[in-house]
Every structure is written in structure tokens, then in C-alpha cells.
Amino acid sequence: MSHGLPTAARLICVCALGALLLAPAANADLRVGAADDHPKSSPEVAARFYDAMKDVGMTENRITLLWDSAHPTTITGQENLAAAIRAADADGVRVTLDIYPSKAKALTESRVAPGRFAAFAAEVARTFPTVKDFIIGNEPNKSRFWQPQFNANRSRAACSAYEPVLAASYDALKSVDKSITVVGVGLGPRGTDNPLAPGNLSISPVRCIHDIGLTYRRSKRTKPIMDALSYHPYPNASTDKLDAGYAWPNAGIPDLARIKQAVWDAFHGTGQPTFEEAGMPNGPARTLKLRLNEVGWQVSIPPANRSAYFGKESVVTTDEGTQAAVYGNLIPILACDPSVESVLFFNLVDEANLDRWQSGLMRADWTKRPSYSIVKGAIAAGQTRCTGRRVAWRHDYRPVGVHLNFLGGSRRRSDRNKFWSFVAGSEEGTRYTAGLYRARRPGRVAPTLRALIARSLRTVRMRGAVLRSRGKLVGGWDKVIQFPTKRLKPGYYVYGATVVAEMNAARKATYVGRPFAVVRR
């Protein structure tokens, strides 16, 4: 059966994905690779696997290594892992080892477990001295890999508990070799933040980063805990387009600025570097890199290849042509983000169990999908080097995407009216304090009144406000902000509101509308 590339996959359109593209082209090439454990199977499989990687032009493979808390010093499958690393070294493939516990509760059951885990990571580094990249943990924001996600009082637990594990592992690995790159988190792209969610206890990536940063600050640590951040920007569904993304506080490939902002909110002004910023002095404080260590769009299996698989598909899939177009598009996009070091496709070769992952460039029978030739062509064409304008990210000082639809201007309201409200929204979670104030005249609000409103909104009593309201805005959703019912005397009034970012109280802004008239009817 032919598996030719459909027209949709041939017409590759590189989208901006909402990023700000201003600065000159980047210098460093994007590393493209795979996140695949196939090389551990046998030397023969490893040789075949790395031959395919070299043919595509891939240069990095992430391999997982599970830590068994019952045997804390044992490197499980050491012989096969050593063979896989030797084969990679011989073929010039960079190996990244991802070390995480085999049991979700392994690092929280015992006070000594984090120290034992860090010691294990150091021993692995000594055992495999050619490996210079280590990821600590895997998706601690998901209950499949870390438990508990929440405390008994329903507060978030997982990411706060993860921070000391990362810190201890950082110190242990650096004691072996200072040139080792310690990669943090391996963060999943979505979470419910709901301690009562049936079957899906998870924490969103933005809130996970916040909790890691809060624990770091409370520890009074002055050293970094990671040299790079590992992120897994899977789509919400494999039928999503590349530019679909997520609503805050989750994040996909189009939302990487959200992750960078979360890191800045969590760590700015500490010993942990944040991401490079356009137009800023990018010294030691802004050297953190982003590694997209798992990316994949799952596809349906052609009938001709179905015999290589078993089980039943458990998710909605896309077609192979669409997958190829997505994979081809994302390489030049990510190449123009100076913070992104690498993108690894999960997997290079499909898992045979249909209840697992089928997002590879090759099917389980090792036949090539259209995405294989598309990715190979993109790398050969030099699309791993930015040829356009690179992403010029800078952190926000204010809440992101705030909009308020105040009543004002020429609109008049009757003095018989008792209902007062306006519509507000923001792109991230925020808290608001809003008030309705008397104004002397229509038109532009005088600076003195604007300053008075701003001061009032910063106080608990909101002195001078005729009506008051407080609450939260959910990121990505508009809300009708309602005030207590009350009839107002004829005159001029104006709305004011202060909005504060949920993740960083220092990011706040005050907004004042235009005066409107209340007239006697």
C-alpha cells in the first residue's frame, strides 16, 4: 500500500503562533532528536535505531532509567543501558538520561528517599561518564508519576515536594562533574488543579512551576537547581492543529511564553537563572534553556501495518499526513526561539501496544511514516537554524491580557437602576478589586481622581468607593463583575479596578474607566 504524503502535509506553512518576532536571527542550531527506549532492547536494535536516527539527521536521544526505592543503589538493566550508550557514543548521538522513580510514592514515603535518589543519580553519572545530560523526574505534576498530588487539606503537594529532590540531585550530579547539565522537572503540559478530579489528579504546569519556586525561596538556597527546564508540550488532542495551544494555566507549543513567564515569576531575583530576554543584559541570571523532551501527535495505523500492533486504541488520533505537516512546521518555528535548545519526538519508533503511544516517525514494524521524510528534509534544508526573525520574549510586569468593558462615556443610567456591573477578563488567573466612584464631570478622568481611585483600591475598605466588589478572574474566561444592588443619586460616576496576577502579586495594574451619568427619571 502506498503511504504517499497528502497535499495538506506538503503545504507547510510556518506560523508565528502568536510569538513576538522582533530580534535578529538566532545563532545556535536547534537539536532535533527522539525520546525512545528502543536502544535498551538489544545491541542489534540499538544499531538499527541509531542508523535510522543518523539517516533522519537526529542528534539526541533521551533514554529513561527507573529508580527502585527497594534497591536504591541498583542500576536496573545496567548492561543493556551501557550497550545503548556505547552504541550512541559510537554514532555521535547525544544521550540524555531521564531518572525517575518506578513508583509514584517512592520519593514521598520516606524522609531519606530524596537523598538516596540523589546519591543514585550521582552513581549513574559516575557509571556512565560520557553522559552529560540528566533529567531529574518525569511529569511530577501527574499522579501517574508522583503521589500525592494534593495534601489532605486539598492544597497542592507534588511540585513543592519535588523541589528538594531536584536541588539534592543538582548538588550530587555537580559533585561528580560540574560540566553535567542538570535538567529539571520533565513537566507535563496540562493539569486539572482539582483535588477532587475523578481519575485525573494533576497540577497545571504554571502552578507547578510556581510551587517549585515558592519552595525554593523558602529554602533560602542561593545556588541553582537546574541548568535547563524539560517540558512536554503535547497537544490536548492529537487532532489539534499546531497553533491550537491551551488556556492558562496549561501550555502547549504556542504557549511557551506562558512557561517562561511562570519561571520568571517563580525565580526572578534568586540564584536560579530564568530565560533569556530581548533587549536585556542576558548575563548569568538569564541562562536557563528550554528542552522540549517529549513532543508527539498520535496517529491511526494503516491496515497494511496493523499486524505489528496489539490491543485497542484509547484516544482520538490524527492521520499520518497531518502529523507530518505538524512535525515539519514545528522545527523552523522552534529554531527561532533562542530559549529552546532541543525538541525530541516521542518516539522515533511506535510502541506496539495501541493503548500506549503511536506518535513516531516510524511504525512498530519500522516502516517509515510521511513524517520521517518531512523531518529529514527539514533538517537537511537547514531549518534547525533560524533564517527569519527570532522570538523576542520579555517578561510581563502587569497581568497578561487584561480587558475591562467599563460602562462610560455618553451612556446614561436612570437613578431608579439598582444593578451595576461590568465585564472583565484576563489571559491568566488574576484577583481583582473593583469600585464605583463619584466623579465631578464627564470626559477624561483627572489625574488627581485617578490617583485617589488607585490608592483606594489598594486598601481593604476602599475608602471613597460608592460600591465595592472583589473576586477572581479565571484565565481565558470573561466574567460579569457585579456590585451590591443600590440606587445611586444623580451625578457622574466612574468604575475603577486593580487586577493582580495570581502567580505574582507584584504584577498588578489599575484601570479607570470614563465617567457616566446617572440621571433622574
Positions of PLM-derived features:
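Bacterial N-terminal signal peptides
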Residues: L11-A23
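Boundary/entry segment of secreted carbohydrate-active catalytic domains
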Residues: A28-E60, T64-L66
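Noncatalytic carbohydrate-binding groove/subsite architecture in carbohydrate-active enzymes
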Residues: P43-A46, A113-A118, A157-T317
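Aromatic-rich peripheral "rim/lid" segments of glycoside hydrolase catalytic domains that contact
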Residues: E44, P72, P140, R144-F145, ...
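Substrate-binding cleft and catalytic face of glycoside hydrolase catalytic domains
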Residues: M53-G199, N236, L348-E351
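Structural beta-strand segments of beta-rich domains
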Residues: R416-F422
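Glycine-centered tight-turn motifs at strand-turn-strand junctions
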Residues: P442-G491
